[in-house]
Amino acid sequence: MAFANLRKVLISDSLDPCCRKILQDGGLQVVEKQNLSKEELIAELQDCEGLIVRSATKVTADVINAAEKLQVVGRAGTGVDNVDLEAATRKGILVMNTPNGNSLSAAELTCGMIMCLARQIPQATASMKDGKWERKKFMGTELNGKTLGILGLGRIGREVAIRMQSLGMKTIGYDPIISPEVSASFGVQQLPLEEIWPLCDFITVHTPLLPSTTGLLNDNTFAQCKKGVRVVNCARGGIVDEGALLRALQSGQCAGAALDVFTEEPPRGRALVDHENVISCPHLGASTKEAQSRCGEEIAVQFVDMVKGKSLTGVVNAQALTSAFSPHTKPWIGLAEALGTLMRAWAGSPKGAIQVITQGTSLKNAGNCLSPAVIVGLLKEASKQADVNLVNAKLLVKEAGLNVTTSHSPAAPGEQGFGECLLAVALAGAPYQAVGLVQGTTPVLQGLNGAVFRPEVPLRRDLPLLLFRTQTSDPAMLPTMIGLLAEAGVRLLSYQTSLVSDGETWHVMGISSLLPSLEAWKQHATEAFQFHF
C-alpha cells in the first residue's frame, strides 16, 4: 500500500507532546525543530518522509520540490493555505488536515465575538482600565430575536448556529455543498446570497479561502446589507475585503466587526485594528489547550493509521487514496491499475478518450476513485515528469493528452452479462476493451473485446502475463509457443484461453519474466502483448 514505507516525521511547529508520543508508539521516528528558515526546513526534510505543521511553517513549492523523500504533509488544523496544494499534488505528495480538531474552539470564539460585538465588552473594558465610567457610551443590543447570517455551514458553521439559536437568534445561511435539508436539520434556513444580505443583523463567515470566496463581503455586498450590520470573521483573512469593511465602518453601514484573521498576519496596516468599532485577536481560533491537544492527537493517529494500512482520514488532495484503504474498494483499486497497465501494453501509448465503466450496486459511485488507479496503470512507465500515483494521477493524465471519462452502467459493460459487479476500461473509437472483476480479494480479467475467459484470469503483481490472439485452435500452436518461451529462457507458469469469439481465441500465459521481444510471437498470432503491473 502507498506510503507504507513512511518512517521518519519532522514536526516543524509547536504541538502538544501527545503528537510525538503517538507517532513514536506507532513505530515512527520523530524530529521536532521549530522556527526553521526555508533553507533549514529543506535540509531537515532530506531524510524525512513525513512533515507535520500548524500554520507557521510555509510549505511552498520550493520546499516541496526540494524534499526528495517527502510523501505526506499533515496540517494539525483545518486550513491548508500554508501548503502549496498544487505543487504537492503534482509531486504525488499526500496532504492531510484535522477538520474536527479545532472546530469547537473556533465556533466558541465566534460566539464570543458575536456577544462582544453586541455589548461592546472589549471597548468597555478598555475604558474602565483607562479610569473612566462611560455607561451611556457603550449602549448595546440584545441578540434575542436578531438574525444571524452564517456563510459556510460545515462543522464550525453548524456549531455556531446551534449555540446562537440557544440565545434566541434566527439563523439563516448559505453553503453551495450542504443541502437545504441538511442545514434545516440544525435550524438554518438556506437562502441565496442576494436574499441574505438585507436580512442580517450579524454575519459570520466560515468558508475556506478560495477564488470564489475571496472578497465575499465587498463594497457591493455591504451596500446590500441592512444598515448597522455587524460582521465576524474567524475563518480566513481575505474572505471579508478589508478595504470595503473599513469604508463600511466609516460610513456607518457596518456598526462593528470582530476579526480573528487578516489578509496579512500580523497586519501591517493599523486602520482596521485601531477602529473604535473593531474587536480583533491575533488568530486565536484554535488557540485553546483542548484544540491543540486534539489536533496534535488527531494528525498523529492519522499518520499511524495510514502507515499501518488501517484507514486514511482528513485527506485534502486524494479522494481515491482514501477509498484505497477501504476493505471493499482496495482490491478494485488494484484491478483498475491492472486494467490500465494492460491497456497501455495492448494499445501502445493510447491517446484520446479512455472510458472507465462500472457495473453493480456497490460500484455505483466508485468511478471517481477507480479512474485515478486506471490512470496510474496507463502512465506509470510513461510519465516523464513525476512518479505517478493516486494523488497526482488526474493532474498528470491531462498533460499526457488523455481524457478519462467515468460512467456507471446498470448492465454489464460490453453487454457480456456476467457477474454483479464489473469494471471495464475502453479506448474510445478503437477496438480495445478490457473487463475485470474481483473474486474474493483477487482482481481477475474476465474478457477482452467480447472474448470471455472461463475461468477468469487472475491478475497478480508478481506474475507477468503474455496475451495473444490466434485463429481457432491449431494443434501445433501451443507447442510452438512453448518452444518460443524456451528459446528465450522463460518458463510457462500458467495457461488459459478465452471462449471463441469471431473465430478467434485469446490465450493468456503466466510467465516467469517478460520476454525481450515479441517479434517471433507476432508471426504466429493476430496480435500479442505482455504486461506486468
From Swiss-Prot:
EC nos: 1.1.1.95, 1.1.1.399, 1.1.1.37
Pfam families, per the entry: 2-Hacid_dh (PF00389), 2-Hacid_dh_C (PF02826), PGDH_inter (PF19304)
Reactions accelerated catalytically: (2R)-3-phosphoglycerate + NAD(+) = 3-phosphooxypyruvate + NADH + H(+); (R)-2-hydroxyglutarate + NAD(+) = 2-oxoglutarate + NADH + H(+); (S)-malate + NAD(+) = oxaloacetate + NADH + H(+)
Phosphoserine found at: 14
Key words, A-Z: Acetylation, Amino-acid biosynthesis, Isopeptide bond, NAD, Oxidoreductase, Phosphoprotein, Serine biosynthesis, Ubl conjugation
Stretches of the chain forming a coiled coil according to its record: none
Keyword Disulfide bond set for record: no
Gene Ontology terms for molecular function: L-malate dehydrogenase (NAD+) activity; NAD binding; phosphoglycerate dehydrogenase activity
SUPFAM superfamilies attached to this UniProt entry: Formate/glycerate dehydrogenase catalytic domain-like (SSF52283), NAD(P)-binding Rossmann-fold domains (SSF51735), Serine metabolism enzymes domain (SSF143548)
Active-site residues (renumbered): 236, 265, 283 (proton donor)
Sequence positions bearing N6-acetyllysine: 21, 58
Cross-link (Glycyl lysine isopeptide (Lys-Gly) (interchain with G-Cter in SUMO1)), chain numbering: 21
PROSITE patterns the record matches: CASEIN_ALPHA_BETA, D_2_HYDROXYACID_DH_1, D_2_HYDROXYACID_DH_2, D_2_HYDROXYACID_DH_3
N-acetylalanine sites (modified residues): 2
Highest taxon of the lineage: Eukaryota
Subunit structure: Homotetramer.
Cited function: Catalyzes the reversible oxidation of 3-phospho-D-glycerate to 3-phosphonooxypyruvate, the first step of the phosphorylated L-serine biosynthesis pathway. Also catalyzes the reversible oxidation of 2-hydroxyglutarate to 2-oxoglutarate and the reversible oxidation of (S)-malate to oxaloacetate.
Protein name: D-3-phosphoglycerate dehydrogenase
Organism: Pongo abelii (Sumatran orangutan)
Gene, per the UniProt record: PHGDH
